[in-house]
């Protein structure tokens, strides 16, 4: 979203205009704010989003899926650094973050809460460790044919 101070009233107006339930649009807004900060970070080239279809107006009209799943090169330090990125207050960001980290079988899980004004949205970020070269090879071979 463009560089603007957003208010709840702005989302309510867009909710009516786009015919999206307000709670769904709020959740989508928080997810997209997560991705906006992520895309401007040092991590943007070290992760591959597995479930990008959870983003976008059509998905918000149907149902919100508040889990983002990423593949990431194996590095146990990255999830903690990523969590710290979100816990830092950014003046230009309308969303404030709180969160915790936990280890999973093949990766890590961040349990975040994005707060926009007084409203809170839970967001789960799954980080699955995998050598991305294998995945990029599959993606490239699919694009060639």
Which residues does each PLM region occupy?
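Compositionally biased terminal segments of proteins
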Residues: 1-145
